[in-house]
A protein has these predicted regions:
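Histidine-centered, transition-metal-coordinating active-site segments
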Residues: 1-80, 84-90, 98, 119, ...
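Short coil/turn segments at secondary-structure boundaries
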Residues: 67-78, 91-92, 107-114, 127-130
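Aspartate-rich (DDxxD/NDxxD/DxxxD) Mg2+/diphosphate-binding motifs
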Residues: 100-129, 135-136
Length: 275
């Protein structure tokens, strides 16, 4: 049985929540192009991002620990893949568009320079007389200008909603870049923002314990971590390597569940009935 694009769009309309961004309602691309016979617009965007040079380069960019510190620690690439997993889990539970969510999640860190947030801060200082440096703006520049894959235009010619999701990406440590876009973006984009913070919380704890920068005893000072440990029968003062993995897994599951429930509650309270 084949599922052509038209049927995929119908399935979205039938199965997704009223407030989900449907691919059939996209605001389109800057440059008109033929539609794929078996992929929706957001599926095409996701695939294009995966095949970029910028995406492959994430493997060698620092998350917290530099690449040479060991192959256990996260890089921008592994962090991105974790954000994709968290984002899709939340999007699926809320009835949002997983393809759009995944495309935004895959591209949300493409503009980061090497050496983590310190590298970005120093680069911003060096570029102050030339407009500064901001990684969301750089991600847009990569996807709309620097990646050259098509003879008729520069960039990947992604849909409006994916580019909007990158421009409006915002976390406590990284403000959004919104000169071309208004509002908070789609709910799918907001889920990626939330998932970014969730992935950070879980893997920074994991990497911190693994490296010795955090001691198991320090975790006992955090009440909900004590509760999570108690549920699994873990002693935070004598945390084994297996215990660390169990704790991180529990933390990740807890945050995903709480984020999903809180988002659903807010959507219901606000009476959101459309994208």
């Amino acid at each position: 049985m084949l599922f052509p694009r038209e049927r995929l769009l119908e399935l979205e309309a039938e199965r997704l929540a009223p407030y989900a961004q449907k691919a059939r309602d996209t605001r389109g691309r800057e440059h008109p192009e033929p539609e794929s016979p078996y992929r929706t617009p957001y599926q095409k965007d996701r695939d294009r991002i995966l095949h970029t040079t910028a995406f492959r380069r994430l493997e060698y960019k620092t998350q917290v620990f530099p690449n040479w510190a060991g192959d256990y620690y996260r890089t921008r690439l592994t962090h991105t893949l974790e954000v994709v997993q968290v984002s899709r889990s939340i999007a699926r539970a809320l009835g949002l568009n997983e393809d759009l969510t995944e495309a935004i999640a895959l591209s949300h860190d493409l503009g980061h320079p090497p050496f983590g947030h310190t590298g970005e801060r120093i680069l911003d200082e060096l570029m102050r007389d030339h407009g500064g440096f901001e990684h969301n703006a750089q991600a847009l520049r990569i996807l709309t200008h620097l990646e050259e894959r098509y003879p008729g235009f520069k960039g990947l010619n992604l849909t409006y909603e994916v580019l909007e999701g990158i421009a409006t990406h915002e976390t406590p440590y990284a403000p959004s870049f919104k000169p071309l876009y208004e509002g908070q973006g789609t709910l799918e984009a907001q889920v990626v923002d939330l998932s970014d913070a969730i992935a950070y919380a879980a893997h920074d704890l994991d990497d911190g314990l693994r490296s010795g920068l955090l001691s198991p005893g320090e975790l006992a000072e955090v009440s909900f971590l004590r509760d999570l440990a108690r549920e699994e029968g873990l002693d935070l003062e004598r945390l084994t390597e297996l215990g660390r993995r169990v704790l991180v897994r529990q933390l990740l599951g807890y945050l995903i569940t709480e984020a999903t429930l809180a988002t659903h509650r807010r959507v219901e309270e606000a009476g959101v009935a459309s994208a």
